């Protein structure tokens, strides 16, 4: 669907493509009056919409569904800034703590009807792609305020999300946090063990895609 068609369909004054992630989905930012909305389309987006609907129904902070169809989704904008932004140095310890707080709150949810696509036993609600760009922080309070990109959300091993954020924080895309020491600190703030072998195990699985059915 081209940008003009999207604008007409949803009554938007402006439509701008957003380049995010590696999922292959099309994402377009739409401005409609005072609202900022996001249109997402591609394989698996209907599954993501189901997960987003469930997460919103239990009151966890995430984008709200405005409309949906066959492998497309229109959502509200999350408040705050994502954790991959260049936060002021003085704020970064609090941002790390907020990332850990958000994951702990997600893990403790109950009643999730979806399994994680990753192997490994556990009873935590896992995001499945808990990386810095998918976690939002309130810039005023420095508290966790939401998550997005939920296509892999499901019940599984809590070390999955610890591993994926560990990878995100120690990698070259988020040098502002200081690399490996920050990744280890995040796991400790959560209450985990940064030397647990499951961290490297899940990073390897994610990199290889071998968890996919």
Feature map (PLM): residue ranges:
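Active-site acidic catalytic loop and adjacent metal/ATP-binding pocket
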Residues: 26-31, 108-160
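Active-site activation/catalytic loop segments of kinase-like enzymes and analogous catalytic loops
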Residues: 160-194, 205-213
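Conserved protein kinase catalytic core
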Residues: 82, 135, 155, 167, ...
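Short pocket-lining segment of the protein kinase catalytic domain that shapes the ATP-binding cleft
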Residues: 73-81
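A conserved alpha-helical element in kinase catalytic cores
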Residues: 22-25, 34-73, 85-106
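Regulatory N- and C-terminal appendages and interdomain linkers associated
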Residues: 1-10, 48, 208-213
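ATP-binding glycine-rich phosphate-binding loop
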Residues: 2-32
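Protein kinase-like catalytic domain
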Residues: 56, 103, 107-110, 170, ...
């Amino acid at each position: 669907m081209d940008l003009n068609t999207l604008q007409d369909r949803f009554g938007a004054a402006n439509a701008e493509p957003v380049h995010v992630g590696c999922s292959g989905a099309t994402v377009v930012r739409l401005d409609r009056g005072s609202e900022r909305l996001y249109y997402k389309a591609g394989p698996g987006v209907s599954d993501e919409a189901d997960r987003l609907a469930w997460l919103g129904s239990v009151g966890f902070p995430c984008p709200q569904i405005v409309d949906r169809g066959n492998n497309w989704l229109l959502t509200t904008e999350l408040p705050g800034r994502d954790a991959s932004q260049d936060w002021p140095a003085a704020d970064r310890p609090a941002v790390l703590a907020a990332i850990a707080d958000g994951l702990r709150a997600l893990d403790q949810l109950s009643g999730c009807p979806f399994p994680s696509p990753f192997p490994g036993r556990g009873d935590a609600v896992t995001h499945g792609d808990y990386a810095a760009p998918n976690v939002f922080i309130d810039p005023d309070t420095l508290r966790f305020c939401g998550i997005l990109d939920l296509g892999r959300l499901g019940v599984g091993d809590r070390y999955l999300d610890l591993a994926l954020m560990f990878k995100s924080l120690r990698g070259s895309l988020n040098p502002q946090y200081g690399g490996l020491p920050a990744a280890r600190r995040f796991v400790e703030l959560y209450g985990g063990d940064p030397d647990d072998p499951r961290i490297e195990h899940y990073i390897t699985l994610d990199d290889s895609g071998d968890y996919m059915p």
